[in-house]
Design a protein with these regions (language model features):
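Divalent metal-coordination and catalytic microenvironments
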Residues: 21-24, 60, 103, 387, ...
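Alpha-helical transmembrane signal-anchor/signal-peptide segments
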Residues: 32-37, 122-140, 145
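Membrane-embedded helix-turn/re-entrant segments that form the catalytic/gating core
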Residues: 30-111, 190-196, 203-217, 314, ...
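Functional transmembrane alpha-helices
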Residues: 86-87, 91-94, 207-236, 241-385, ...
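Internal alpha-helical transmembrane segments
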Residues: 67-135, 158, 185-186, 372, ...
Length: 443
């Protein structure tokens, strides 16, 4: 069910964002007087279509992993003299650049609109208050204290943990990062600098702030078992609802630390208290259908105090402003990450593919529509930035050729363009393949 849900959620994201992207090209082409033969969502065999009064075929094709706008173009077909004024290749450099750039621009505008809706409706969140700083961690070395709230990272406002995680993740490979904090409930600022020179973390296994030793305020958890999953390691070991768990040395178990230990996949030796009787148990994690280690227990959760809860909600004008700010912030962060991947400051192992997107889509849609919309906006920004990357097969590559044409006064030769397209296609396939390989390795 989870796989099916993730797949459907992923296909909806792709269908919506590809439609938005291609509509940008289509709208700009129409505005510039270019005849459009076909607007297709998907590739391959057409399974549904209709034609409008201007002769454009709107189609849905069999492979729902992309789309295209086919325009009248003398480079690909014979164009009658009477239609040359409507051909893409007969438009000015500025008009062609506008048509090409309109696709990524549409993705950015969609992200702004999506975040506008998110911030108008309101998205529940948790204030970035630190509950604990792990001993000997990078955060501890910087003398960061519990019960402080992170308000800025390198001068950028941090209203929630999601923003903090995103900002910190982009600092990987840098030497330091500056944090602004206030004692919770106070306005007195503290400034701390974290030394990142030896910092590494695996985004698949931990958060960026968690790897620095920062533990956020979360729902309080008691290791009194409230549920045992059927056919789980816990049930096989005879654990029951109401059992209280401790480490083998009788020390208290922190739930989130316990989860980290479970993900190591190694046997866990525990003390169990049941009706005043103590005994030992060893839980050996097993892999579930999501290929994650589990033992099949649920502790007792207590609601997080309201003082730590917040809702990111604004009036319409401010929500629009926040939507623009968020889109620009994500765009810049995406560019920084791409730059670090190219320079080697960030491992290519962090590159994700369609499976990562599908998992994110499925997870966000299960949480709620507002989170799904926020995820869609994030992917839309990434799609816009990636399409502006100067590879010849992408919009950015086409724009590079147009800049060269404007500087030289004549188009780049077809031979150079064809060779560039082949090289670009190979590089793009290699990147996509690497992303897919990384996805499979994470399963």
């Amino acid at each position: 069910m989870s796989f099916l849900w993730s797949t459907v959620s992923f296909l909806i994201v792709i269908a919506v964002l590809v439609t938005v992207h291609e509509y940008g090209h289509f709208w700009a082409a129409r505005k510039c007087g270019v005849k459009v033969h076909r607007f297709s969502i998907g590739f391959g065999k057409v399974i549904w279509s209709r034609t409008d009064k201007q002769g454009t075929e709107f189609a849905v094709s069999a492979i729902p992993l992309g789309g295209y706008v086919k325009m009248l173009d003398g480079r690909n077909e014979e164009v009658p003299e009477t239609l040359k004024s409507q051909a893409f290749d007969h438009k000015t450099v500025a008009q062609r650049a506008f048509i090409i750039a309109a696709g990524p621009l549409a993705n950015f505008l969609f992200a702004i609109f999506a975040y506008f809706l998110v911030y108008s409706i309101g998205i529940p969140s948790i204030k970035p208050v630190i509950d604990e700083v792990r001993p000997q961690s990078i955060a501890a070395m910087a003398q960061i204290q519990p019960n402080t709230q992170i308000t800025e990272i390198d001068g950028v406002s941090t209203p929630d943990w999601e923003t903090i995680n995103m900002l910190l993740a982009t600092k990987l490979g840098e030497s330091k990062v500056d944090l602004t904090l206030v004692e919770f409930g106070s306005n007195i600022e503290q400034h701390r600098t974290l030394d990142l020179s030896n910092w590494t973390f695996d985004p698949e296994k931990q958060s960026a702030f968690g790897s620095l030793g920062i533990v956020p305020v979360r729902s309080k958890v008691d290791m009194i078992l409230s549920k045992i999953t059927e056919n789980s390691p816990a049930e096989k070991e005879g654990l029951r609802k109401g059992d209280k768990l401790y480490w083998s040395d009788n020390s208290k178990i922190e739930w989130y630390t316990f989860l980290e230990k479970v993900q190591e996949g190694k046997p866990l030796t525990l003390k169990v208290e049941r009706d005043g009787v103590w005994f030992d148990k060893t839980l050996t994690p097993e892999l579930n259908e999501k290929k994650r280690w589990f033992v099949g227990i649920s502790p007792t959760f207590y609601p997080l105090a309201n003082e730590y809860r917040t809702e990111l909600k604004y009036d319409m004008l401010e929500a629009l402003q926040k939507g623009v700010e968020k889109t620009f912030q994500l765009s810049w962060l995406t560019i920084k990450v791409i730059g670090k991947l190219i320079t080697g400051n960030l491992s290519l192992n962090n590159l994700g593919g369609p499976i990562s997107i599908a998992k994110g889509a499925g997870a966000s849609s299960e949480i709620g529509l507002i989170y799904y919309l926020s995820f869609m906006a994030l992917i839309s920004v990434n799609l816009g930035i990636m399409n502006l990357f100067p590879l010849p097969v992408l919009d950015g590559g086409h724009l590079v050729f147009l800049v060269m044409e404007a500087l030289k006064g004549k188009p780049v030769s077809e031979h150079v363009q064809n060779v560039s397209y082949r090289i670009g296609a190979v590089l793009l396939l290699m990147l996509m393949g690497l992303g897919l390989i990384n996805d499979f390795l994470r399963l």
